[in-house]
From Swiss-Prot:
Gene: RPS6KA
UniProt keyword terms in alphabetical order: ATP-binding, Kinase, Nucleotide-binding, Phosphoprotein, Repeat, Serine/threonine-protein kinase, Transferase
Database matches in PANTHER family: RIBOSOMAL PROTEIN S6 KINASE
Domain Protein kinase: 80-339, 435-692
Annotated catalytic residues: 205, 552
Protein's name according to its UniProt entry: Ribosomal protein S6 kinase 2 alpha
Length: 752
């Protein structure tokens, strides 16, 4: 089930009272400021503080010492280029920054900047807590502090930049998942919490927006400003902090709490992930706290017995009886039957594949951060550098297009795109601000592809301009963002949306079309053809395993990124017809969800689309081997002739090149071009075929080809026939029907 909608990932936090270093409460300046009424923010309630906790404490000015990344020199603000504002809290901002000095130049970080002048004593304490904890923690599921330093007026924390956004918001908006999927995230979270507890740290602020995703989909715990360092597990903290719905009973009634309070919050998160709602939530914070202290929790019966058992063990109001509070700590959690399928060692080594991969593109993407912040120009920065200035090359896409940009006819603006695209450049940046458009390099029915030059770097790119009134490119963009990091899939560089057109910027594909290059080579062998198909099929198998079908794998959409002709430089392009497997509500589905809950007819349709991809690769393989296309003799063949041959599965593997081609190659071609899509080999089966696995034993004799233009014309005719609209049936008198005529013959003759 999708998760409930959650709070913003960067809420403004009002901390009314926090402990100072000696464990006492610090007095507030200027009386008691009112608490925020919202229940989804972090806060401290002063009127709940017992009189025994109100003694005046010793206030200490916090002086943050420098923390330097291993192998680096002492850092200062001048070493970081401000790129974007990611968020803003009550006493500081968070920026996306790029390191501009060695040894980690060009690396992206998140930088917290805290102004000393605006910090009250409680905030200074909170900052020191975060800095000390982060400096001590080194764990795969906890955010890492790389640098810490200060100037006369500011404090700086340089942290991991996590591009995936927060776990709950991403899952609630994008994907359908199962109890098995939830188990993965909870298991990683348990390891992160266990590590903090082993250092004597009580997290105390475990809530959805503090669990972030990296680009692979693994979790990272962040924001330790409310954590309490204890000498050992016998020590208790008394400050009232955290987010109310996730508070343990002993935190609410201020009896003092230890690390076991985190396991209560862990149970709240587990309940929320599995059900989409919070276990204890009243109409206001007072009622919510009453429910936490007294309410009996009903357990949803759709949860497994193991999940219900773990929740009951975590929701013990007496912390001494709570699972995880004993001397074995998190080992008690890990031994619970709910986690019987988890390999904890593999999980720690990040060897278990996450159920969901966030759609993130280039390293400086900030899709998953609030546009309220990301659209702002970073203060003290000359401006947001156009992202095409990144110091790396970006791959291009296929050449599909029309003269759209010359169309002066005004059309109504289309609805805004997927939120991912809306957030890319904020609100005011236009494509023409960063690029100069040059000549067209391809045309199509709904888009134009042109060469363009980045104004700052003078680097050449290609831009695909899509008319939104003719096609919604959201699916194409999301697929490229999520899977474009694969080495043989085009990488989306930039996206712009002016309301009428969408601009997809990629690198210019300098190597041209795959078939062009192969047919023009003086020498091309069966062994080389095997290497080419292996690279392409491996990429298609990756897409199919992610629930993505391309649906337009004609040879003109497979290109070389450079002139080398190496299989590694092959790119699958143009995902304009590609689809991701989705639930009825439009959300993506994890592999586990697909296997257990998707209707057979949906899977059958997905299998059909995958079969179409394999058929297209079969056509490509046939052409590489035979030097001609399987179903068209030339561009003059009619669609009816071509479709008849395709429908009958009629193609020849005799004569010409076929006389010297191996039998194992003929076997593979026949199985990829099988007329029944459900009987064709899958991409995985193609990769396991002897023609692929034993390529070193294949012949190296030269293959002969027809004229390049003749082959390309025949290929174009093939796909044109497939895409041509089917003629509507002509209505004729019933008497002309063969069935009616047959029935008339069977009628008994009668005489009056």
């Amino acid at each position: 089930m999708p998760l409930a909608q959650l709070a913003e990932p960067w809420p403004n936090m009002e901390l009314v009272q926090l402990d100072t270093e000696n464990g006492q409460a610090a007095p507030e300046e200027g009386g008691n400021p009112p608490c925020k009424a919202k229940s989804d923010i972090t806060w401290v309630e002063k009127d709940l503080v017992d009189s025994t906790d109100k003694g005046e404490g010793v206030v200490k000015e916090i002086n943050i010492t420098h923390h330097v990344k291993e192998g680096s020199e002492k850092a200062d603000p001048s070493q970081f280029e401000l790129l974007k504002v990611l968020g803003q809290g009550s006493f500081g901002k968070v920026f996306l920054v790029r390191k501009i000095t060695p040894p980690d130049s060009n690396h992206l970080y998140a930088m917290k900047v805290l102004k000393k002048a605006t910090l009250k004593v409680r905030d200074r304490v909170r900052t020191k807590i975060e800095r000390d904890i982060l400096a001590d923690v080194n764990h795969p599921f906890v955010v890492k502090l790389h640098y810490a330093f200060q100037t006369e007026g500011k404090l700086y924390l340089i942290l991991d930049f996590l591009r995936g956004g927060d776990l709950f918001t991403r899952l609630s908006k994008e994907v359908m998942f199962t109890e098995e999927d939830v188990k993965f995230y909870l298991a990683e979270l348990a390891l992160g919490l266990d590590h903090l507890h082993s250092l004597g740290i009580i997290y105390r602020d475990l809530k959805p927006e503090n669990i972030l995703l990296d680009e692979e989909g693994h979790i990272k715990l962040t924001d330790f400003g409310l954590s309490k360092e204890a000498i050992d597990h016998e020590k208790k903290a008394y400050s009232f902090c955290g987010t109310v719905e996730y508070m343990a009973p002993e935190v609410v009634n201020r009896q003092g709490h230890s690390h076991s309070a985190d396991w209560w919050s862990y149970g709240v998160l587990m309940f929320e992930m599995l059900t989409g709602s919070l276990p204890f939530q009243g109409k206001d914070r007072k009622e919510t706290m009453t429910l936490i202290l007294k309410a009996k929790l009903g357990m949803p019966q759709f949860l497994s017995a193991e999940a219900q058992s773990l929740l009951r063990a975590l929701f013990k109001r007496n912390p001494a009886n709570r699972l995880g509070s004993g001397p074995d700590g998190a080992e008690e959690i890990k031994r619970h039957p709910f986690y019987s399928t988890i390999d904890w060692n593999k999980l720690y080594r990040r060897e278990i594949k996450p159920p969901f991969k966030p759609a993130v593109g280039q390293p400086d993407d900030t899709f998953y951060f609030d546009t309220e912040f990301t659209s702002r120009t970073p203060k003290d920065s000359p401006g947001i550098p156009p992202s095409a200035g990144a110091h790396q090359l970006f791959r291009g896409f296929s050449f599909v297009a029309t003269g759209l940009m010359e169309d002066s006819k005004v059309k109504p603006a289309q609805p805004p795109l997927h939120s991912v695209v809306q957030q890319l450049h904020g609100k005011n940046i236009q494509f023409s601000d960063g690029y100069v458009v040059k000549e067209a390099i391809g045309v199509g029915s709904y888009s134009v592809c042109k060469r363009c030059i980045h104004k700052t770097t003078n680097m050449e790119y290609a831009v695909k301009v899509i008319d939104k009134s003719k096609r919604d490119p959201s699916e194409e963009i999301e697929i490229l963002l999520r899977y474009g990091q694969h080495p043989n899939i085009i990488t989306l560089k930039d996206v712009y949306d002016d309301g009428k057109y969408v601009y997809l910027v990629t690198e210019l594909m300098r190597g041209g079309e795959l078939l062009d290059k192969i047919l023009r080579q003086k020498f091309f062998s069966e062994r080389e053809a095997s290497s080419v198909l292996h690279t392409i099929c491996k990429t298609v198998e990756y897409l199919h395993s992610q629930g993505v079908v391309h649906r337009d794998l004609k040879p003109s959409n497979i290109l070389y990124v450079d002139e080398s002709g190496n299989p590694e430089s092959i790119r699958i392009c143009d995902f304009g017809f590609a689809k991701q497997l989705r639930a009825e509500n439009g959300l993506l589905m994890t592999p586990c969800y697909t296997a257990n809950f998707v209707a057979p007819e949906v899977l059958k349709r997905q299998g059909y689309d995958e079969g179409c991809d394999i058929w297209s690769l079969g056509v490509l393989l046939y052409t590489m081997l035979a030097g001609c296309t399987p179903f068209a003799n030339g561009p003059s063949d009619t669609p009816e002739e071509i479709l008849t041959r395709i429908g009958g599965g009629k193609f020849s593997v005799n004569g010409g090149n076929w006389d010297t081609i191996s039998d194992v190659a003929k076997d593979l071609v026949s199985k990829m071009l099988h007329v029944d899509p459900h009987q064709r080999l899958t991409a995985k089966q193609v990769l396991q075929h002897p023609w692929i696995t034993q390529k070193d034993s294949l012949p190296q004799s030269q293959l002969n080809y027809q004229d390049v233009q003749l082959v390309k014309g025949a290929m174009a005719a093939t796909y044109s026939a497939l895409n041509s609209s089917k003629p509507s049936p002509q209505l004729k008198p019933i008497e002309s029907s063969i069935l009616a005529q047959r029935r008339v013959k069977k009628l008994p003759s009668t005489t009056l």
